């Protein structure tokens, strides 16, 4: 489980987070939806232990991720927005290397096959397309069978067939009991994946619930623009 409570974070005079709060439950996909600058990535990086909040608290698997030991981090899978992958290696040796850090890793061959990585397995990371790197980064996040999984825009740049495969894999990971958090700009992705939806704007949570609850009597798109437009500073 993840609990985010009243987080604030400023970069100089820019207030990236302004008291944001939300929760994410095991065996569910929680989608964070919001415009650029809403604070989604900053919030997730704090929950991953990559940044420290100015105030507020965050708990991931009952621990503060900023101070968590290596054993805690091994239970958490992270897919960064920029991939964060070493450039000079090929995908399969990288995934096999990562799998050695876990007691019960995923089957690298099966995972690579499902994501179509075997189609470009002989190419170094630096020569892959953006969509291909996305798939390798997702596999790297999944290889340890994480209890918590953070995915920052996991289907950006993917073609429709691969995107559908990734959605199915994410849903199955949550179905196996993981707490999955996905940041996205896509209404389709949020409606397809989210058991729980958080809409962020201007560093705050402006709506939280199921996609149907957030949409109300209209569409999610209509509700989103109504919520985020009125949250923008004048």
Place the predicted regions along the sequence by residue.
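Helical segment within the ABC ATPase nucleotide-binding domain
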Residues: 163-176
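Conserved ABC ATPase "signature" region
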Residues: 96, 100, 105-121
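Catalytic Walker B motif of ABC-type/P-loop ATPase nucleotide-binding domains
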Residues: 149-153
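Conserved ABC transporter NBD signature motif
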Residues: 56-64, 72
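ABC ATPase "signature
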Residues: 208-209
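Helix-to-loop junction immediately C-terminal to a conserved catalytic motif
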Residues: 48
